[in-house]
């Protein structure tokens, strides 16, 4: 079995899922094309990182689908001078994307294990 090509999967996610949902902001598409979504997921779900699915994180929490994350980032219209507060950061992927679009991001997560995993993913 061949290992999954995450780079190709990321490219296809943006071109076949996110962009068709009218996410056309080039900065948002660039961020979603480069930030490794799989790094923010439990190992058991990494092979589904680029599927059009909300994936379980534990504690009854789920990721947003990539198309929803793209729409949210586009709607925020973040500027490089903006400061962002993310409450309920979950796996940290959205905060990571925002961090590449804005000046500073403060992400809060009530579940310690999710916060630690998000911190680790953001440190990579």
Predicted regions and their residues:
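N-terminal auxiliary segments of SAM/dcSAM-dependent transferases
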Residues: 1-44
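Conserved alpha-helix/loop element of class I SAM-dependent methyltransferases that forms part
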Residues: 14-15, 19-20, 49-52, 59, ...
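Conserved nucleotide-cofactor-binding alpha/beta core module
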Residues: 77-124
């Amino acid at each position: 079995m061949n290992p999954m090509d995450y780079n190709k999967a990321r490219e296809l996610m943006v071109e076949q899922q996110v962009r068709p949902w009218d996410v056309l902001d080039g900065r948002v598409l660039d961020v979603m094309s480069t930030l490794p979504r799989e790094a923010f997921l439990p190992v058991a779900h990494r092979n589904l990182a680029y599927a059009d699915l909300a994936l379980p994180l534990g504690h009854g929490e789920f990721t947003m689908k990539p198309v929803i994350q793209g729409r949210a980032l586009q709607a925020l219209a973040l500027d490089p001078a903006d400061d962002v507060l993310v409450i309920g950061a979950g796996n940290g992927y959205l905060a990571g994307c925002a961090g590449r679009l804005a000046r500073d991001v403060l992400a809060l997560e009530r579940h310690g294990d999710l916060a630690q995993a998000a911190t680790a993913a953001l440190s990579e």
